């Protein structure tokens, strides 16, 4: 019996899994909140917690270790200048997973992965968008000839009957 042969948590190759984790962690630190599936969020959470722990003490060694994982210099700077100091008093549990429900297309469990001190009001100020859908061009105007049964030159005739 072959024990422990079933390791493939995201059903993808190792290089793709590594790139996926790296990109999602970078997005998490950049936007401080991402929406994804539950298994991906669990993988990203594990990596993000380790990187935040390293970013709490700003040293050359820690910067280089984190830079192996996060290639975006702006996100790396944000991690060490903003996120790390904010989490300095916390001993772990820097992220939270909020369940959103099932995705309609494939019934996958969708969750929100966010940093613990993330505030929703802060993001609302950044994205001031309206919830209304813009109307189509010309919506609401009806063709007068179709409604009243008039011909465009002004003569009226009955709709549906031919003149013989």
UniProtKB/Swiss-Prot annotation:
Any matching Pfam family: Ribosomal_L17
GO molecular function, one term: structural constituent of ribosome
GO CC, one annotated term: cytosolic large ribosomal subunit
Residue ranges, annotated region (Disordered): 127-164
Taxonomy, superkingdom: Bacteria
Keywords: Ribonucleoprotein, Ribosomal protein
Alphabetized InterPro entries for the sequence: Ribosomal_bL17 (IPR000456), Ribosomal_bL17_CS (IPR047859), Ribosomal_bL17_sf (IPR036373)
Any one biological process term the GO annotation gives: translation
SUPFAM superfamilies, A to Z: Prokaryotic ribosomal protein L17
Subunit organization: Part of the 50S ribosomal subunit. Contacts protein L32.
Family statement: Belongs to the bacterial ribosomal protein bL17 family.
Name listed for the protein in its UniProt record: Large ribosomal subunit protein bL17
Organism of this sequence: Treponema pallidum (strain Nichols)
Name of the gene: rplQ
